[in-house]
A protein has these predicted regions:
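C-terminal structural segment of proteins
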Residues: 1-324
Length: 324
């Protein structure tokens, strides 16, 4: 690990006023990257003591989650468990208990890909070293994305939490250097990797202060994760979904997927294919076909196309009670 300057922030302005600094909160991802010298910041700003640790109701019946709320505390919150069950399940499906105790809401959104080549400084990687190439294109790509990829990068986004938040229609609250706060829909927060080194709309000196969840929506919701082992493994495919059935027909649908996209993946066309339909495996299959219609798999991750179809169908079957 290379030498760096360390600053402990006492106010948000200590962060937004130092745009050249790297932010550290729980450090569960950043410290690994620093030890491997994938990231070599000259200056760290520790935000762990900022007043961003509250979960509070919003005026419209939603929830404001401070950026420093830990994954463990968020998963255990009674309102989250009752009204945003898919989010609680997604959080508990990620990492380990020890990591969830340290990992924060803002840090989870900003965690870096687990692409092997991003972590190997001897290999070309456009995320780590722009313009050097993407080793995963012709190399080991089993974990990689099949949607939202470019000829510059096929890395998948690793977060479980962000997939559930994408399905729930979350917004990210961001504070700039001038103290002005803006909110960005999570659906607009992440960027397709045309420039793989730029992953989000965050500008230098900006700080995530909270995530805003809308008022709870009607219907049943769940989070399903398919992975190599039962715990402490990233998703090959995951689905966060909410479905409402009224008078025998689907009237509301919200679906986001993980493990298959360069970002938490939500395709409105998949949801639209379900609205007005009677729940049935044939209907779910057509929606699943839409999900993977534009997939561009590589040799190592081609299995994700049928796996994504099956996972979505199984999730919708569970939520609607359709007989197998």
């Amino acid at each position: 690990m290379k030498q760096f300057d360390y600053i402990r922030a006492g106010a948000n302005s200590d962060v937004t006023g130092t745009p050249d600094a790297t932010i550290i909160a729980g450090g569960t991802n950043l410290l690994d990257l620093m030890k491997l010298e994938v990231m070599t910041p000259d200056r760290l700003v520790d935000i762990s003591r900022l007043d961003l640790k509250q979960i509070t109701p919003t005026r419209d019946g939603g929830l404001r989650i401070g950026a420093l709320v830990t994954n463990s505390d968020l998963a255990a919150d009674m309102t989250v468990r009752s009204d945003y069950a898919a989010l609680s399940s997604a959080l508990l499906a990620g990492a380990s208990g020890q990591l969830r105790n340290k990992a924060t809401t803002g840090g989870n959104l900003l965690q870096r890909t687990r692409c092997y080549y991003f972590y190997d400084t001897d290999q070309p990687c456009n995320k780590r070293d722009p313009g050097s190439g993407c080793s995963a294109m012709e190399g080991a790509n089993r974990l990689h994305a099949i949607l939202g990829v470019t000829d510059k990068c096929i890395a998948s986004h690793p977060s479980d939490m962000a997939v559930a938040m994408q399905m729930l229609g979350a917004e990210v609250e961001i504070e700039a250097a001038d103290g002005v706060t803006r909110t960005v829909p999570l659906s607009d927060f992440y960027l397709i990797p045309t420039d793989p080194a730029v992953e989000t709309v965050l500008q230098p000196g900006e700080l995530i202060t909270a995530v805003i969840l809308p008022a709870p929506a009607e219907g049943r919701q769940t989070y399903r994760k398919v992975r190599d082992r039962a715990s402490y493994a990233f998703a090959m495919v995951s689905v966060a979904a909410r479905i409402k059935v009224t008078d025998g027909k689907i009237t509301q649908a919200a679906i986001a997927c993980g493990g298959i996209g360069s970002m938490p993946w939500r395709d409105p066309a998949v949801e639209e294919a379900l609205i007005g339909q009677e729940p049935a495996r044939e209907v779910f299959g057509k929606a699943a076909d839409i999900l993977v219609a534009e997939a561009t798999p590589k040799e190592g991750n081609a299995f994700k196309v049928p796996l994504a179809r099956r996972t979505l169908i199984a999730t919708l079957t569970e939520l609607t009670g359709v007989q197998q």
